[in-house]
């Protein structure tokens, strides 16, 4: 990926940071978006720029601001001269059981998981078409098999799967669009629904009998970014076999 340019949303931590490190090691230049994780974003930028100077830049933005999304693309192109890969990774995740769902929950979860990827992909499409690039969306295995009490999140990720396939048709043949559906990779922070007993139960239902790691998703990101010139409109489950047992 030497000379290629990647825009990663939610790139400061967890799966985003793991993907950033792997793509950077492959030679890519990175625009890393963050919303509130400034400390982590700057630390990652310093780490990677120490390896290859001026190869990583940061952009802070609230992805709920639809009108501001094109500026992420414009700033990436202004900084690095183009855009080859858009990784829609940023996501909100929390329970919304029926009876407790408010409009604010709907707007937040739909906004980060579906609306932002849609409008950011639309803004990036002209540049990606010029450079025959790709879009990679981080979906979820629960897009097809909804998780109890996570109604809005599951619906939003189902929409993102549909968006992935729709964009693959709309942007072909110049742009490839694929998705990655993680399983039990990193446990949500501060969510009591995922206590130790729940975690062990989930892991026991994976075929590989272990939780995954952000690097597992990063490897799939690199696969779609670098090695799949004849794959588009597909969703790859990286879940230790859990979705086959749900």
Give the location of each predicted region.
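Alpha-helical segment proximal to the catalytic Tyr-Lys
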Residues: 126, 168-173
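A glycine/serine/threonine-rich, flexible loop-to-helix segment
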Residues: 45-46, 179-206, 245
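Short, small/polar-rich loop/turn modules that mediate ligand/substrate recognition or access, typified
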Residues: 172-176, 232-233
């Amino acid at each position: 990926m030497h000379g290629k340019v990647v825009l990663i949303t939610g790139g400061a931590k967890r799966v985003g940071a793991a993907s950033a490190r792997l793509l950077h090691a492959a030679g890519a230049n990175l625009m890393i978006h963050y919303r509130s994780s400034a400390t982590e974003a700057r630390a990652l930028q310093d780490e990677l720029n120490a390896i290859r100077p001026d190869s990583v830049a940061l952009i802070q933005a609230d992805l709920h601001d639809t009108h501001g999304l094109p500026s992420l693309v414009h700033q990436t192109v202004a900084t690095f001269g183009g855009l080859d890969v858009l990784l829609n990774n940023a996501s909100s995740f929390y329970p919304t059981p029926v009876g407790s769902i408010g409009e604010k929950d709907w707007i937040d979860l739909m906004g980060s998981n579906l609306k932002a990827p849609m409008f950011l992909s639309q803004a990036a499409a002209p540049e990606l078409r010029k450079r025959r690039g790709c879009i990679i969306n981080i979906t979820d295995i629960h897009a097809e098999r909804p998780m109890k009490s996570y109604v809005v999140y599951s619906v939003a990720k189902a929409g993102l799967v549909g968006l992935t396939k729709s964009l693959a048709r709309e942007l072909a043949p110049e742009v490839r669009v694929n998705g990655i559906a993680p399983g039990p990779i990193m446990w949500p922070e501060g969510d009591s629904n995922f206590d130790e007993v729940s975690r062990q139960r989930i892991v026991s239902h994976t075929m590989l009998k272990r939780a995954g790691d952000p690097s597992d998703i990063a490897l799939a990101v690199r696969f779609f970014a670098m090695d799949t010139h004849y794959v588009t409109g597909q969703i790859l489950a990286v879940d230790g076999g859990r979705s086959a047992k749900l």
